[in-house]
Amino acid sequence: MSNSEFKSLGCSKWLVEALNAMKIVQPTAIQKACIPEILKGRDCIGGANTGSGKTIAFAAPMLTKWSEDPQGMFGIVLTPTRELAMQIAEQFTAFGSAMNIRVAIVVGGESIVQQAIELQKRPHFIIATPGRLAHHVLNSGEDTIGGLKRVKFLVLDEADILLTETFSKDLATCVSILPPKNKRQNLLFTATMTDQVKALSDAPQTEGKPPVFTFEVESVDNVAIPKTLETTYLLVPEHVKESYLYQILTSEKYVKSSCIIFVNRTVTAEILRRTLKSLDVRVTSLHSQMPQQERTNSVQRFRAQAARVLIATDVASRGLDIPIVELVVNYDIPGNPDTFIHRAGRTARAGRHGESLCFVTEKDIQRVEAIEERINKKMEEFTDVGDTAVIRKSLTKVTAAKRESLMAMDKEGFGERRKLQKRKNESKEKTHRRT
Amino acid sequence: MSKEYSDVDDFASDEEEDNQVLITGKDAKKNVIQFDQEEDEEEQEEEDEEVQDEEEPEDKVVQLTEQQIEKEKQRRLKKLKSDKKTKHKTGVVYLSRVPPYMKPAKLRQILTRFGEVDRLFLKREEEHKHQQRVKSGGNKKTMFEEGWAEFIRKKDAKLCASTLNGNIIGGKKGNFYHDDVMNVKYLPGFKWADLTEQIARENDIRQAKLQLEISQANKLNAEFIHNVEKSKMVNKMKQSKKRNQQESQQVDEEVRRTFKQRKVASTRASAPDSQRQSQPQSKALNDVMHSLF
């Protein structure tokens, strides 16, 4: 059989068949290494490039173990973003559809009551973001979250970002209700080894448990990005970035390709979306100041190619697996070189070809140098779109469109809600401190 | 009060529904003022007049003798003065609540009992509210939340407010709206223009700002184009220089200007120290880590 590989790693027959039906035949390096060890019952820390199949590396052994002894609330997967949670849940459902699997998504921005009802039904797997799960742990009754005390698996996907200050409080709440650490299996997966993850892998062995299994593909070859990814840069002044972007998106080479544009701020994302929309580019956006319904819709629209350009903040930089993406544009250069790796990792997935383009302004030289050092590769200059073309075709048009969208945003009060929320939180904290 | 009508769209959105009503009101007024438009253009009403209306009286004027023209002028002047007066005399009432699903036409009919109603505006309920109502099995009809009505005579407006406020609509006993209690308030010293003034002003400011910004952006663009051309020129000069000198000596690239660079902040364990973000670990995070492995 062609897929004896997965079987030899110890996966159940039904799972191998399900994977086979999805044309997943050959296990990747991280899957080969991690699946047998996890099946043995060891804790695991896995580090591998973007798009190297980390999801299956923890899904396959969990599903195998679960099918041996099906029970409600078998495993919890924590992810940093809502969209990633939905994607993982989709994959779990797809793999386990033959076994009547029940997967619950517990993420922010959706009905709390609905989620509580779903938790009461004892789903087999819970895919959650820490904030909302913590809310349930704190506020729901015993019948809703009692099952969490018997969880067998805890997975932290994108562990490097989960193990930061941002999530620490919620994470602590979530972990507090789970069984003690030697009664469950902990799996950490990440594309970046941070101090925290390193510290965990060096942590002393807990009693009654085999030692932690640490696996890092990255250390084999020191290139952090996929080999099929082309990296280019374009030197451009700050205030004409939009014009260049528009020209590139409408240039012959890219007029039909799907692409993701990464920005650093939600405001920039909104400006760009409006500008490009008024210039008749099929565009959608994803950032934290959109209602959850719209966020989900826009990811689906992009997946279904109803929109060909997705403008996103770093909320989309991790984990999202959309195979059709051909070009990733770093409209703003991220401060953290590893963020670049994650962003660029949205394309060139699973051996496909992909391109990543950086817009470099006069202030970003240092950042780009840090990125080049990190990925161990020099970027080439982007030459497909020249200055003359931009000046002649898009400059005036785009600037007018940008100003108009700025005005419209001003009128509609973009960002007001967030400011209000911030003020509310601050005043709440103040009263909290006083009491 | 500005909050209630701060959104221009609200005004626009009602147009399909009560346009006829508004137009009938306008037409009535147009007839009154039709004659006094051609010469006193500065006195023109804010309402947009159609071209047709202007042409008709012109033809008439040609046929008249001079004396008659003089008379006509006098008459028009008089009319204009009286018209100004009527503008002064208008009164606006505010309705804090509109009976459920009542349409502007019906409301106009009710208010006309007290005197001639000129303009009427009802604010439609918000879209998501409507959707929610329909979703939970409610009526699909449009509901209006509040409204304003302009009476040609103040007297009528006051009468309307004092009579209708807090009372049922009445009429025939079987009427659908017979028992609905109205809430009408006369707004003293308030004109219809006050309602739209703020929105119009805001729009004007926005438009002016937009023009200003676009012109500024164009200046920046011109500068950019200039710079691109300059760089091309400089590059060519450098090339030709190189060719002439046959690389006899290294051309010194002097640094003309430096820019303040944005910060690099890495959290990776193996990153060089210059890029590392100093991150004091909090107790909470430590606890989590301990409870994990």
From Swiss-Prot, chain A:
Residues 409-429 have a biased composition (Basic and acidic residues). This is ATP-dependent RNA helicase DBP8. Signal peptide: none annotated. Pfam families: DEAD (PF00270), Helicase_C (PF00271). CDD domains: DEADc_DDX49 (cd17955), SF2_C_DEAD (cd18787). One of its GO terms (biological process) is rRNA processing. It comes from Kluyveromyces lactis (strain ATCC 8585 / CBS 2359 / DSM 70799 / NBRC 1267 / NRRL Y-1140 / WM37) (Yeast). Its EC number is 3.6.4.13. The gene is DBP8. Its main location: nucleus.
Curated annotation (Swiss-Prot), chain B:
Residues 267-284 have a biased composition (Polar residues). Its main location: nucleus. One of its GO terms (biological process) is endonucleolytic cleavage in 5'-ETS of tricistronic rRNA transcript (SSU-rRNA, 5.8S rRNA, LSU-rRNA). Residues 1-68, 234-286 are annotated as: Disordered. Residues 7-19, 36-58 have a biased composition (Acidic residues). It comes from the Eukaryota. One of its GO terms (cellular component) is nucleolus. Residues 234-243 have a biased composition (Basic residues). Involved in the small subunit (SSU) processome assembly and function, and in the 18S rRNA synthesis. Required for the early cleavages at sites A0, A1 and A2. PANTHER family: ACTIVATOR OF BASAL TRANSCRIPTION 1. This is Pre-rRNA-processing protein ESF2. It comes from Kluyveromyces lactis (strain ATCC 8585 / CBS 2359 / DSM 70799 / NBRC 1267 / NRRL Y-1140 / WM37). The lineage of its organism: Eukaryota, Fungi, Dikarya, Ascomycota, Saccharomycotina.
